[in-house]
Amino acid sequence: MAHPHLLAERISRLSSSLEKGLYERSHAIRLCLLAALSGESVFLLGPPGIAKSLIARRLKFAFQNARAFEYLMTRFSTPEEVFGPLSIQALKDEGRYERLTSGYLPEAEIVFLDEIWKAGPAILNTLLTAINERQFRNGAHVEKIPMRLLVAASNELPEADSSLEALYDRMLIRLWLDKVQDKANFRSMLTSQQDENDNPVPASLQVTDEEYERWQKEIGEITLPDHVFELIFMLRQQLDKLPDAPYVSDRRWKKAIRLLQASAFFSGRSAVAPVDLILLKDCLWYDAQSLNLIQQQIDVLMTGHAWQQQGMLTRLGAIVQRHLQLQQQQSDKTALTVIRLGGIFSRRQQYQLPVNVTASTLTLLLQKPLKLHNMEVVHISFERSALEQWLSKGGEIRGKLNGIGFAQKLNLEVDSAQHLVVRDVSLQGSTLALPGSSAEGLPGEIKQQLEELESDWRKQHALFSEQQRCLFIPGDWLGRIEASLQDVGAQIRQAQQC
């Protein structure tokens, strides 16, 4: 058995060879290759002339001595054109109803059926058995068929509540393709002199029959860790709650798990990882609406839960809140004391800020939280100039509650100890205090919790870095996950600097 990382490198090189001369079709080739290597089926949706048939032809070259069958369905197609003509000799001499299958679907490893929804019931029923059981009933005998990949294509989806839904449900991977978009790729496609039917794969990379059979057993040995199952179940529950979510059968979930196992196996891993779950975006949708919905839900799963991003942010919020509580407990020591000005006979007492308070924006902590303007408030941000004017001349004073939003009007006063006191609508008061000096640093309790959180973040980021080397996952998805982890890391580091 090849080393897992050597196998992953080989599959990557095999895919690169198959992709040569095909523009903006890398993802489709890679998923079709994954389907072929795990014995699954693919549905390609898109307008005519966008290389759907060429993708299927290319996949034949992934295997040594693979046979291919390609057919364009019409409403007049007959089973003989797909599964082979009847043997007149057998019928005449022995009275046996038997098909001559050489060169037809029952003896092909790679099958491409275009305009699949135009097939009649006789073809569809036989095709369902071929997909489900890899068997073909030929007269009185049941023969095993060698089909490794079925690629079905159409420029439309099957009608809802039609007899075609059973076949559509067997198409595990569903890809929506479009014309070449990039200008440079479009030019290269127009000027390419490459013969699209040439074999682009070196013999050393092609998969032998023995390797294919061995890999089918080894794919089944890839484990599904508990934390990955929990993510899958979370996705399933979330979809069940959404009124517009597509119906996903238990059969489709089970077949999707084998695809995830194959993704892990051909990426050199012994267990399914969260990154493999991104493949579900190409397995669970039914139509255009559900395609967008599925992608949104998987994006939330990947950027919020798969590497504990949301859990770490929740922990960080609790740590920050605890830090504020500790600061509030020290507020008596750090209560802002203003300086009294003028004589005792002045018509209005005037005050000023201490000379060591020089920041242009002051963040003052409440000794105890108050509900102000329908918000639980633990600190208030003031513009220094506005606070100085209020201390000197009185009038209206405004501040940002918890440092966010617009400045709100406040009921602020100076008590007999020359401390600033803010009051709520019930006149409950809370003394305002300066945050602890930065020189004092974080309390030991908070520092330890932040260090533990940062350590957990580093572990999750390292896990993602190891897992993201997956050929079958688009780079833009990996980029969004990396950004979500970096955002969590930045917030942790910011809290450590407070």
Swiss-Prot record:
<dbReference type="Pfam" id="PF20030">
    <property type="entry name" value="bpMoxR"/>
</dbReference>
<keyword id="KW-0378">Hydrolase</keyword>
<feature type="binding site">
    <location>
        <position position="196"/>
    </location>
    <ligand>
        <name>ADP</name>
    </ligand>
</feature>
<feature type="binding site">
    <location>
        <position position="50"/>
    </location>
    <ligand>
        <name>ADP</name>
    </ligand>
</feature>
<dbReference type="Pfam" id="PF20265">
    <property type="entry name" value="LARA_dom"/>
</dbReference>
<dbReference type="Pfam" id="PF12592">
    <property type="entry name" value="ATPase_RavA_C"/>
</dbReference>
<dbReference type="GO" id="GO:0005737">
    <property type="term" value="C:cytoplasm"/>
</dbReference>
<dbReference type="InterPro" id="IPR046898">
    <property type="entry name" value="RavA_LARA_dom"/>
</dbReference>
<dbReference type="InterPro" id="IPR027417">
    <property type="entry name" value="P-loop_NTPase"/>
</dbReference>
<dbReference type="GO" id="GO:0016887">
    <property type="term" value="F:ATP hydrolysis activity"/>
</dbReference>
<feature type="binding site">
    <location>
        <position position="23"/>
    </location>
    <ligand>
        <name>ADP</name>
    </ligand>
</feature>
<comment type="similarity">
    <text>Belongs to the RavA family.</text>
</comment>
<protein>
    <recommendedName>
        <fullName>Regulatory ATPase RavA</fullName>
        <ecNumber>3.6.1.-</ecNumber>
    </recommendedName>
</protein>
<dbReference type="Pfam" id="PF17868">
    <property type="entry name" value="AAA_lid_8"/>
</dbReference>
<comment type="subunit">
    <text>Homohexamer. Interacts with ViaA.</text>
</comment>
<feature type="binding site">
    <location>
        <position position="49"/>
    </location>
    <ligand>
        <name>ADP</name>
    </ligand>
</feature>
<dbReference type="InterPro" id="IPR003593">
    <property type="entry name" value="AAA+_ATPase"/>
</dbReference>
<dbReference type="InterPro" id="IPR023671">
    <property type="entry name" value="ATPase_RavA"/>
</dbReference>
<keyword id="KW-0547">Nucleotide-binding</keyword>
<keyword id="KW-0143">Chaperone</keyword>
<feature type="binding site">
    <location>
        <position position="53"/>
    </location>
    <ligand>
        <name>ADP</name>
    </ligand>
</feature>
<feature type="binding site">
    <location>
        <position position="52"/>
    </location>
    <ligand>
        <name>ADP</name>
    </ligand>
</feature>
<dbReference type="GO" id="GO:0005524">
    <property type="term" value="F:ATP binding"/>
</dbReference>
<feature type="binding site">
    <location>
        <position position="51"/>
    </location>
    <ligand>
        <name>ADP</name>
    </ligand>
</feature>
<feature type="binding site">
    <location>
        <position position="54"/>
    </location>
    <ligand>
        <name>ADP</name>
    </ligand>
</feature>
<keyword id="KW-0067">ATP-binding</keyword>
<keyword id="KW-0963">Cytoplasm</keyword>
<comment type="function">
    <text>Component of the RavA-ViaA chaperone complex, which may act on the membrane to optimize the function of some of the respiratory chains. RavA functions as an ATPase.</text>
</comment>
<dbReference type="InterPro" id="IPR045427">
    <property type="entry name" value="MoxR"/>
</dbReference>
<dbReference type="InterPro" id="IPR022547">
    <property type="entry name" value="ATPase_RavA_C"/>
</dbReference>
<dbReference type="InterPro" id="IPR041538">
    <property type="entry name" value="RavA-like_AAA_lid"/>
</dbReference>
<dbReference type="InterPro" id="IPR050513">
    <property type="entry name" value="RavA_ATPases"/>
</dbReference>
<dbReference type="InterPro" id="IPR046932">
    <property type="entry name" value="RavA_LARA_sf"/>
</dbReference>
